[in-house]
Amino acid sequence: ACDLSRDQMPALYEGSEITGALLPEVAKAWGMATVPVVAGGGDNAAGAVGVGMVDANQAMLSLGTSGVYFAVSEGFLSKPESAVHSFCHALPQRWHLMSVMLSAASCLDWAAKLTGLSNVPALIAAAQQADESAEPVWFLPYLSGERTPHNNPQAKGVFFGLTHQHGPNELARAVLEGVG
């Protein structure tokens, strides 16, 4: 499709494999000894190693701008129908499954502005004041399209179930529940 041969592709390495060394002139300029350079890993895989997600069947949920469910596996597990991704982990002989929601904590900033609140802590406080007797409001956090489980860059965010009984507090709660 792109007229590139395998010879034109870079070498592949395990994340922990040494691929070179810091250039001597850079090491000298920085006052360092020779430093090995390793292949490394993607942001989620490196973060997973940092919190100890290194063995098969371990999993974590990471909420930042996006939301990531990360599960360690011993091999490649393809789930294309669900848009669950399978990647090499940053560690040798490990893989991981990853589901990504493109808008997670970023929705909290957006909702705080939408409801006229000053910041995310104020949004959380408002959510805690939501009327428990009110009918539920549902929020789909597709403010940047979506990747998992529906790989659709055109997906849009939605509030539904709104009535006259709902206000900023109920919207705040819906956003927190929709992201979580």
Model-derived features with residue positions:
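Conserved phosphate-donor
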Residues: 12
